[in-house]
Curated annotation (Swiss-Prot):
Biased composition (Acidic residues): 29-38
Gene name of the record: E7
Name the record gives this protein: Protein E7
HAMAP family linked: PPV_E7 (MF_04004)
Single GO cellular component term: host cell nucleus
Amino acid sequence: MHGERPTLGDIVLDLQPEPVSLSCNEQLDSSDSEDDHEQDQLDSSHNRQREQPTQQDLQVNLQSFKIVTHCVFCHCLVRLVVHCTATDIRQVHQLLMGTLNIVCPNCAATA
């Protein structure tokens, strides 16, 4: 800009908007208080339903979950999709945080 006052002619709008990918491959860990709250809700619902859930009840609660981890041997990215209940995916999470490791197809073929 030149002069004491800016004018419309002094402002150059030559920048074009660029597309930005808003996808993120990172998953946020829920806080312990959220986990406790969810677990309390699950416990109270289980206490209300003392009888065994039917196969149809289990199918209603099934969901697909994506698991992204690294191969224990070559450290390449391994993606899995599992179909289970929220309770089961918590158990899988605990196992993966412990001693359970995933092996990629290439390393599995040579093992």
